[in-house]
Amino acid sequence: MEVYLASAAGLLSWCGKWRKIPTPLAHPTLLAACGADVALADSVNRLLYRQGRVSTLPPGVEVLRCWRNQLLTLSSETNCLTLYDAHDYPLITSPAGIRPCDCAIVDCQVIVCGCEDGCLHIFSLPDLREIAAYPVPGCPMRVAADGRVLTCLSLLSPDPPQTLLFRLCLTSGDFAPVALLPGWCGAVAIADDHTIWAGVGEQLLHFPLDSVVPDVQLGEFGLIRFLSCQQSKLLISDPWAGRCLLMDTTPPSAPHQLYAGECGGCCFASCRKGTLPDWKASLNEP
């Protein structure tokens, strides 16, 4: 099992130990796994890098996703969702909410957290045509998809901050609140067993299937921004505390710190020989 991390030290890969992968981006903030490839974004300097190509990003990019072999970006500054062609040039741009800050891909659709407009927007791919908008309580800020069921974090109140965790079925339109939690929206992810992991405020919580009560509640985080689940492992990136952690989820155990320092997006990738593209061939310790 291999882990990728965007950090102040560059793109890092962990498979038993950390390696630095040479790229033109000195300080990547976001990443997206596209098969055996990894796309990187430096949202501060507005740079995108993939397969040896460097291109320009719109301002305020919050999210980088991969659909098939094409990239998607979501900008909270332009309020737009953008689909790129196979050479990473902007292909289609569509308005998507007010200060949108997260999205998830389900088959040939992308679900966008419209944030300040109070809606979850559904766009078709590849034409980025809006086909539905679901009004939800508060400002939806984080979303994860489990088939046709969305799990979301929505900010109900900023002072003091309160976050609503809820599920929404795209097939039936059924809305199901899970929990009202103290703190800011951080991150949400769905495990292989369809249970929920959520970072809210300074906590990491786990909700079993069909339960409104967490069976795991861990504290002492800054504000978790990225979560990724795979094969009973949970990868955690906590930029506010400046650390990346890994934990077993079955049964849950204490998170193990993998990296300390300024960090951003993270994801799992294959660790099998031969799956990495040529630009990753020269590996050095960070």
Locations of the language-model features?
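An edge-strand/N-cap motif at the start of beta-rich repeat modules
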Residues: 1-25, 29-33, 286
